[in-house]
Amino acid sequence: MALVHLLAYLYLAYLARVTGPLAIDHSVREFFRTSQHTTLGWMLKKWAVFGDWQMLSVGLICLSLFFSPEVRRRFLLFFLLALGGGGLVGQLTKMVVGRMRPRDARLGFPSGHTIAAMITVCGLLYFGARSGVLRRPVAWGLSAGTGALIVLGVGVSRMYTDSHWLTDVFGGIMLGVAVSTGVAAAFEERVAARQPMADQRCQGGSVCGGE
């Protein structure tokens, strides 16, 4: 999954660099520009907090305090690698692509808020599933659906406020999925590699998980 989303992200970045904003970018921008609403606009602007890197970092650190030391270490390491790596790749892509935002001269592709939101949602789902909290399909479905709505809301917020093009948001989603699933796969490989060592320690009369 990580490779598929990474390839899709690179292709979209190529299009953004070569063609600039696509026709659909202009159409979606015009739609939001003609659909401004005072109350809705206020809500959407506030919704962008779910993609704010600093707020998410503080929230994740606070959440980790409820975990055991071992889980806390893995949890914080995951998000350090995923958010840090995603942010770095995103900034490098902005410089390589060089496409401006709709309303100002800042680099726009991909949307950093969307990257952060997507990585956070994917990471929380990963740890929820691994811990068994989301072992039931209903719990998984509700959590994944809620996460998707949060990410979608962040993306809409960035377009509604004329901060990003539609393809900026799509790029952020694809990069977020690629990075988070890639880090999760690396974590799983590390666990699988350590398992034979644990089994070897269980041999020779050691007690492991029972008599």
Predicted features and spans:
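Short juxtamembrane and helix-loop transition motifs at transmembrane-helix boundaries
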Residues: 36-47, 69-71, 102-105, 130-137
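Interfacial segments of alpha-helical transmembrane regions
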Residues: 1-3, 60-85
